[in-house]
Amino acid sequence: MGRKKIQITRIMDERNRQVTFTKRKFGLMKKAYELSVLCDCEIALIIFNSSNKLFQYASTDMDKVLLKYTEYNEPHESRTNSDIVETLRKKGLNGCESPDADDYFEHSPLSEDRFSKLNEDSDFIFKRGPPGLPPQNFSMSVTVPVTSPNALSYTNPGSSLVSPSLAASSTLADSSMLSPPPATLHRNVSPGAPQRPPSTGSASGMLSTTDLTVPNGAGNSPVGNGFVNSRASPNLIGNTGANSLGKVMPTKSPPPPGGGSLGMNSRKPDLRVVIPPSSKGMMPPLSEEEELELNAQRISSSQATQPLATPVVSVTTPSLPPQGLVYSAMPTAYNTDYSLTSADLSALQGFTSPGMLSLGQASAWQQHHLGQAALSSLVAGGQLSQGSNLSINTNQNINIKSEPISPPRDRMTPSGFQQQQQQPQQQPPPQPPQPQPRQEMGRSPVDSLSSSSSSYDGSDREDPRGDFHSPIVLGRPPNTEDRESPSVKRMRMDTWVT
């Protein structure tokens, strides 16, 4: 830091005075040496200390220098202490030590500020500690972050149809969502698609070639009817049928000639569903081979379940395009038609039917791939609000009968996003329309955009008909076995509060 400036006064301490004399005497001689060499001059120093001890320095020979001094008679510069003090005072040094670099190093206010700032910066850097590691986010394409430990992600690179409202890549910070639990039931739907949700029958046609990405958290229910209960999956990625181009069927268009595999993409991409991460049943559409020859049914309404607090976009207006409706493969045993209100939509629990309804003059309910009609999660999870005996066939042909006695089950579209694929596939023409009450209302607080109950013209939406019983026979061989699922008591909506 340099030498400290001292007041040029007599040092009272004897010891300090001796030390200072020794140091400065040598410094003076050093300066004389430098001056003699640099400027080619002769210098002689004669010093007597307080004890009258002589110390002398001469650049060459003291006698020669002294001889010149005695013989020199011309005017010359001669200074004393008073002269030096006066000169220093004029320079503003106030009699302090000479500002030679070797003699002192001054701490100017500017230097003090610099040093203090450097110290503060260094202290801040050291005290701040090492930067925290960034959180590890696992990016999974077209999956929705969920909190359910049963996180299964089904992906098939066959096609790239994705529901427009689904996040393309949602980061899953929870490691439990990255791998499916070993205990979950996972039956391969198609030989070519090992990552399919459990289903049997002819579901292989659609699932094997579709890009079915079930949102994480879609844990397979042990029921294993071919449907996946997407527990806490906010969104459902639309399943595209084999060779489907992911085309959304226009509003109120007749069933696609090819019976394109039904997707669950939203009919109206502008509709945004806010889905809380609570358990939501999901049923991936089954194979296209089972283009169900259901009658062109005018789905007047769907079961009106208790409105949930979940925010939902009302898609139940009579003019809504029926094509976006995803219907459960199982007809409701309930005999009455129910109106689906926007509040009810929040309760829809993504129980997407493998088939979709394209309502033309009478909404033709194409239930593609119902071969795997499995209420896996809904029955096991008790998510069916009004348990009804559903006669579902897991074989390629399904004979679904609705029993008037038992109330309809709550079926919900996982996210209500239905994208109907218009692919030229063999589909039986819609039979004469039969009014069939379809229950798509799920108890989970899912915001299902697919208003399964919205009729083609919106008529008869609000009039439940208790005396109506419409058994729906899906085109299947008569020898197909029906899977009878136990009716489940409808759960109260307070149980869905997360």
Curated annotation (Swiss-Prot):
Residues 444-457 have a biased composition (Low complexity). There is a cross-link at K401 (Glycyl lysine isopeptide (Lys-Gly) (interchain with G-Cter in SUMO)). Constitutive phosphorylation on Ser-406 promotes Lys-401 sumoylation thus preventing acetylation at this site. Phosphorylated on these sites by MAPK14/p38alpha and MAPK11/p38beta, but not by MAPK13/p38delta nor by MAPK12/p38gamma. Residues 58-86 bind DNA. Widely expressed though mainly restricted to skeletal and cardiac muscle, brain, neurons and lymphocytes. Differentially expressed depending on if isoforms contain the beta domain or not, with the total expression of the beta domain-lacking isoforms vastly exceeding that of the beta domain-containing isoforms. Isoforms containing the beta domain are expressed primarily in skeletal and cardiac muscle and in brain. Also present in lung and testis. Splicing to include the beta domain is induced in differentiating myocytes. GO terms for cellular component: chromatin; cytosol; nucleoplasm; nucleus; transcription regulator complex. Keywords: Acetylation, Activator, Apoptosis, Developmental protein, Differentiation, DNA-binding, Isopeptide bond, Neurogenesis, Nucleus, Phosphoprotein, Transcription, Transcription regulation, Ubl conjugation. Gene3D superfamilies: Transcription factor, MADS-box (3.40.1810.10). Binds DNA as a homo- or heterodimer. Dimerizes with MEF2D. Interacts with HDAC7. Interacts with PIAS1; the interaction enhances sumoylation. Interacts with HDAC4, HDAC9 and SLC2A4RG. Interacts (via the N-terminal) with MAPK7; the interaction results in the phosphorylation and transcriptional activity of MEF2A. This is Myocyte-specific enhancer factor 2A.
